[in-house]
Regions:
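Structural alpha-helical scaffold elements that stabilize or flank donor/cofactor-binding regions
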Residues: 92-93, 154-155, 188
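Conserved beta-alpha-beta core of the PfkB/ribokinase-like small-molecule kinase fold
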Residues: 99, 105-184, 202-203
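A short, N-terminal amphipathic alpha-helix
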Residues: 7-21, 41, 184-188
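Conserved phosphate-binding/catalytic region of the ribokinase-like
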Residues: 122-123, 174, 178-290
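Short, conserved phosphate/pyrophosphate- and ester-handling motifs at nucleotide-, phospho-/glycolipid
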Residues: 13, 165, 231
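Conserved N-terminal subdomain of the carbohydrate kinase-like
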Residues: 19-104, 279-290
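Alpha-helix C-terminal capping segments
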Residues: 1, 8-19, 64, 240-244
Length: 290
């Protein structure tokens, strides 16, 4: 199955009718060839997916479950993506970028990928591109919790919109309270204008720099099959709504909706909707975007 946080978002954004480009590096091996073919079949651009003849394609093993959270095992250390260097990212064209979605997973892969991530962040900031950032904490990849916390919070300073989870907030700044989490990130950087905190089935808390925060309730799911991909679904819901000039309330509601649809399927991104499926879901729930 094709997956991975950033790619999940790209697939879901594409499925909702928007153009996406994925930035990564694959090995010159059968797994890399299969992955690139699948990425293209999902309609995601691969202009900036490069091939590495010397290193292998990273992968993940995921336990198949009938409900809840599966165990996952990452095999990415030493992979082609872990060798993606900053100079390669100079070839990434930013002119047509409307929103750049960044995740805290890639900089955890290696020192090389960490520097590449910083370089791309700096380029995006210099080009004044809107950056969404999902901390996507993976302690097993960092192997150093203090460094993970320090660097994820530093990366967040470059983001316009930050999408942490409530549990991530507890690790990153010591509180599970959505308002405390939002205040922390709004106060640490003038660039950050919006923080949307994922609070699980309860929904999401939205806070801007110049207005009172508010909750956007989640949708009830009677049968949770697999939770992997729900957070990425939330991110792509927010991103696509903003691309369509929807309000922040609608963006959070769409994020909640996509997350709810995703947890009802076994794959990492199988539940991400088309526009028609999203419309049908809203109609069944008796809600609409503004």
């Amino acid at each position: 199955l094709l997956g991975g946080a950033e790619l999940n978002v790209a697939i879901g954004v594409q499925r909702l009718g928007h153009t996406t480009e994925y930035v990564s590096r694959l090995g010159a091996d059968p797994l890399g060839g299969y992955a690139k073919k699948q990425i293209l079949e999902h309609g995601v651009g691969t202009t900036f997916v490069t091939e590495d003849a010397d290193n292998w394609t990273g992968f993940q093993l995921k336990q198949m479950v009938t409900t809840g959270d599966p165990q996952t095992f990452n095999y990415r250390t030493g992979s082609a993506a872990a060798h993606l260097s900053a100079d390669v990212l100079d070839d990434v064209k930013l002119d047509d970028v409307k929103i750049a979605h960044m995740s805290g997973i890639f900089p955890a892969l290696s020192e090389t990928s960490n520097q590449a991530f910083r370089h791309l962040m700096d380029r995006l900031v210099a080009a004044d591109k809107l950056i969404t950032f999902d901390p996507n904490l993976r302690p097993a990849l960092w192997n150093d919790d203090e460094r993970m916390i320090r660097e994820i919070n530093e990366f967040a300073k470059s983001a316009d919109i930050i999408l942490p989870g409530m549990n991530e907030g507890k690790i990153l700044m010591g509180s599970e309270d959505p308002k405390d989490i939002a205040d922390f990130y709004l106060n640490q950087s003038d660039r950050t204008k919006v923080v949307i905190v994922k609070v699980g089935p309860a929904g999401a808390y939205v806070q801007t720099r110049d207005a009172e925060g508010f909750m956007v309730p989640g949708f009830k799911v009677n049968n949770v099959v697999d939770t992997v991909g729900a957070g990425d679904g939330f991110a792509l819901g927010v991103i696509t709504a903003l691309l369509e000039d929807k309000s922040l309330r609608s963006a959070a509601m769409r994020g909640n909706a996509v997350g709810a649809l995703q947890v009802q399927t076994p794959g990492d991104n199988d539940g991400y909707p088309t526009p028609a499926k999203l419309k049908a879901f809203y109609e069944a729930e008796g809600v609409s975007e503004d």
